[in-house]
């Protein structure tokens, strides 16, 4: 008899998350569990089928092999697919003997799992990142069920001792000449069975819920920084500790400033006359406009440093600088009078290029020499 597709068994799509797979399995396990269906062979078969599907689809390597090769990829009796290559021996023996010998434990119940860590991607403006602020974040998570207080059992009831392992969480099995232990297949190592599950969480002890957190973002954070909020992740299983929440920061590009560490860069346009004669211009900073003195004969591309006008370091008391690059703009949309004045000005420079434009004169002298050498 051919096996059913594992995704079909659990009633989930192929793009289902691990949480969705786990939720589907728990629903089926509750429905077909042998303790709830004594003597029902069909229910027992359905329970085993769901358990097998769950174990494959929650194991990263086995799931990848199954997705690629189907059942052949996870069948240890066939070559190719999963287990057919030269994998890591530590992983292979850990997978095989971990189940046989109880995962290295000397008996005892499986400990309830700690809650999963969560990640929240937070995008900030440059101003928010530089100055810091408090953000209200809405986090979807798994929270402890308030109806059963996380026990998973119906209110007024409690989990009962597993009749298969008698509360030990482990069972002994004969393997050739050896007697070995493995997690109890009935209670999955917990030692207890929930016969009357909570109507709200359906025996999981946790429910999907959104919570709002006020998170203080320190001044000076940058793209790639991560803020850890201990205990704000998903609730743990049956009273186990919760996971943590990690807020991953990214900073949007700014229309004026470019950030490099604690320094800021910007380009400031200046007129031809201002560059030649000098004067004062207004430049933007994150704290408002400031005056910058431009000396006469300033060339385009010159960099001016405004100390302490950058970003305060999030890890020290150091403060970066603002570096302003002045870029001379060529005047446009000139009227006839303005064009005439420029021609008059140009005429006054004739024969004095070395005096007024030494770089240009040197450049053209170099070009002239290049062609002379080329033709000699």
From Swiss-Prot:
A biological process term (GO) from this entry: DNA replication
Chain positions of all zinc fingers (CR-type): 132-210
GO CC field: cytoplasm
Cofactor remark: Binds 2 Zn(2+) ions per monomer.
Domain J: 5-70
Gene for this chain: dnaJ
Protein purpose: Participates actively in the response to hyperosmotic and heat shock by preventing the aggregation of stress-denatured proteins and by disaggregating proteins, also in an autonomous, DnaK-independent fashion. Unfolded proteins bind initially to DnaJ; upon interaction with the DnaJ-bound protein, DnaK hydrolyzes its bound ATP, resulting in the formation of a stable complex. GrpE releases ADP from DnaK; ATP binding to DnaK triggers the release of the substrate protein, thus completing the reaction cycle.
Cofactor: Zn(2+)
Pfam families, per the entry: DnaJ, DnaJ_C, DnaJ_CXXCXGXG
UniProt similarity note: Belongs to the DnaJ family.
SUPFAM superfamilies cross-referenced by the UniProt entry: Chaperone J-domain, DnaJ/Hsp40 cysteine-rich domain, HSP40/DnaJ peptide-binding domain
TM region positions: none
Domain of life of the organism encoding this protein: Bacteria
UniProt keyword list: Chaperone, Cytoplasm, DNA replication, Metal-binding, Repeat, Stress response, Zinc, Zinc-finger
Name listed for the protein in its UniProt record: Chaperone protein DnaJ
Positions of Zn(2+) 2 binding: 162, 165, 184, 187
NCBIfam families: DnaJ_bact, PRK10767.1
Localization per Swiss-Prot or TrEMBL: Cytoplasm
Taxonomic source organism: Shewanella sp. (strain W3-18-1)
CXXCXGXG motif repeats, residue ranges: 145-152, 162-169, 184-191, 198-205
């Amino acid at each position: 008899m051919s096996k059913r597709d594992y995704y079909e068994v659990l009633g989930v799509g192929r793009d289902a998350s691990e949480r969705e797979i786990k939720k589907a399995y728990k629903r089926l396990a509750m429905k077909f569990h042998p303790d709830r269906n004594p003597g029902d062979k069909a229910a027992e078969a359905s329970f085993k089928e769901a358990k097998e599907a769950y174990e494959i689809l929650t194991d990263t390597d086995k799931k990848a092999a199954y997705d690629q090769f189907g059942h052949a990829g996870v069948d240890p009796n066939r070559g190719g697919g999963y287990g057919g290559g030269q994998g890591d021996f530590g992983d292979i023996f850990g997978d095989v003997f971990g189940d046989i010998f109880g995962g290295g434990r000397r008996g005892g119940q499986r400990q309830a799992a700690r809650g999963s860590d969560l990640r929240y991607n937070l995008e900030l403006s440059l101003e928010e990142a530089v100055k810091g602020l408090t953000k209200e974040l809405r986090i979807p998570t798994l929270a402890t069920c308030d109806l059963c207080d996380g026990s998973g059992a119906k209110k007024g009831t409690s989990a009962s001792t597993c009749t298969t392992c008698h509360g030990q969480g482990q069972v002994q099995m004969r393997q050739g000449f050896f007697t070995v232990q493995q997690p109890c297949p009935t209670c999955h190592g917990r030692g207890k069975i929930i016969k009357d599950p909570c109507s709200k969480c359906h025996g999981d002890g946790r429910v999907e819920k959104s919570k709002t957190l006020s998170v203080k973002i320190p001044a000076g954070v940058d793209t790639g920084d991560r803020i850890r909020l201990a205990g704000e992740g998903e609730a743990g299983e049956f009273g186990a500790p919760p996971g943590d929440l990690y807020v991953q920061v990214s900073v949007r590009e700014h229309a004026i400033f470019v950030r490099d560490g604690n320094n800021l860069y910007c380009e400031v346009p200046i007129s031809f006359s201002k560059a030649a004669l000098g004067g004062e211009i207004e430049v933007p900073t994150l704290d408002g406009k400031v005056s910058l003195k431009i000396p006469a004969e300033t060339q385009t591309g010159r960099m001016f440093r405004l100390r302490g006008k950058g970003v305060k370091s999030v890890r020290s008391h150091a403060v970066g600088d603002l570096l302003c690059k002045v870029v001379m703009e060529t005047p446009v949309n000139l009227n006839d009078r303005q064009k005439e004045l420029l021609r008059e000005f140009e005429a006054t420079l004739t024969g004095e290029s070395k005096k007024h434009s030494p770089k240009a004169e040197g450049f053209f002298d170099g070009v002239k020499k290049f062609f002379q050498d080329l033709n000699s």
